[in-house]
Structure formats: structure tokens, C-alpha cells
Amino acid sequence: MKCGKIKADIMDDGGTNMKIYVHTAEKKENGWYFLCEASLQGLQAKRHMLVDSDACAFAYILEAADAFVYVIMPKEVWGAIKEALRTNEPVFLVGNDATIELEGIHEEVAYLIENIAGNANYGEEMEQAVTAFFE
């Protein structure tokens, strides 16, 4: 599954946290590879996810020594997420200089999907999009 580039690959939110945008998802023999054009050096998987309702996207959290980095997964890569959930295959984030396994992504996404369904707290657009795509 190939997707177009989504916004900039790296965006600084004005604070100490940054966002990395996944722009392509590729299926390989040993799992799914989510590609971005960012340095992943020094980052570690946090095993936690959030929702970016404004962008209608899932966000996986990576930890740096002094900040969090949000890996934004827009609707364009939800097909890969759905397939990874179905097959329980590992998901990796591939940057310019490192690859990180997104540990716990299956459990986190499953929890979010269940929690978002029928829940207006995530915003109507996000709730409808997630329900329509994953149910």
C-alpha cells in the first residue's frame, strides 16, 4: 500500500514535542514497514497511543531523553494498520537512520477503536471515520 506524502514529515509543535508523519506503508515478509523521512536516532517505543482528532489520525508515542515524539498515522495508512491487526504482524517505523518496532501497537489500536466507537469525545469526524473503517 503506497500513500502520498502527508504534510511535512517532521513538524515541531512549538514546544519540546515533535510530530513525525508516516507517508507510506509497505508490507514485507516479516511485517509492516511505515516509512517517514525523519531521524529516529535516540528514540524508543513507548507502547502508548493517542488520537489526533484534528488530523483524523492515530498517534504512536516515541520517547526521547527530554521529549515525546508523536508518530502520526493518517487515514491513508489505516489499511495497513487494519491488516496488521488482522494478521498480528509486527509494525516497524523506518526513518532515515534507524528502524523502530512499534511495540504494543496492536493492543493500543484495538483499545482506541473500541473506545472511539460511539464516543463523541473524539470528535464526530474521527468517530465516524474510525467506526466506518474498522468496524
Curated annotation (Swiss-Prot):
Highest taxon of the lineage: Bacteria
Classification via InterPro entries? UPF0738 (IPR020908)
Q: Which family does it belong to?
A: Belongs to the UPF0738 family.
- Protein name, entry field: UPF0738 protein Aflv_2116
